[in-house]
């Protein structure tokens, strides 16, 4: 087996002033990824990553905590303004957006990029509870 040299790869601190926040809110979880203009990920977080398990991941509070965590990580890289692209039908859409504002970002645009089929695949059957 190869011997470990002991070098640790350090993540260099980029100074990026503006970026894009991708909020993916599904019925089960909310994921927030903050990228630069080219699409390279700067920081990310999700409700599950913040320690919420099961049905608590789909709550607006869990989405708020995930957005705050991703926003604080991105602010360490010098980010100040963001565009927000929201996709999915989940309950964490608005709360994640408010959390990004409360961290201190200046939001320039808000865009809904939820994919809508033009009568594509058949949807799953209705739940009977």
From Swiss-Prot:
Name of a matching Pfam family: Ribosomal_S11
Annotated transmembrane regions: none
A biological process from GO: translation
MF annotations from Gene Ontology: rRNA binding; structural constituent of ribosome
Keywords: Ribonucleoprotein, Ribosomal protein, RNA-binding, rRNA-binding
Function text: Located on the platform of the 30S subunit, it bridges several disparate RNA helices of the 16S rRNA. Forms part of the Shine-Dalgarno cleft in the 70S ribosome.
Similarity annotation: Belongs to the universal ribosomal protein uS11 family.
HAMAP family tied to this protein: Ribosomal_uS11
Protein name (database record): Small ribosomal subunit protein uS11
Organism per entry: Maricaulis maris (strain MCS10) (Caulobacter maris)
């Amino acid at each position: 087996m190869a011997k470990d040299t002991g070098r640790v790869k350090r993540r260099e601190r980029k100074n990026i002033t503006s970026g894009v926040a991708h909020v993916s809110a599904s019925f089960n979880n909310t994921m927030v990824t903050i990228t630069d203009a080219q699409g390279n990920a700067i920081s990310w977080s999700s409700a599950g990553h913040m320690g919420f398990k099961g049905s608590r991941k789909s709550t607006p509070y869990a989405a708020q905590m995930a957005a705050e965590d991703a926003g604080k990580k991105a602010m360490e890289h010098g980010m100040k303004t963001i565009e927000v692209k929201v996709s999915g039908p989940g309950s964490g859409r608005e709360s994640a957006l408010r959390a990004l504002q409360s961290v201190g970002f200046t939001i320039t645009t808000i865009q809904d990029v939820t994919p809508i089929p033009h009568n594509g695949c058949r949807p799953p059957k209705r739940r009977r509870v």
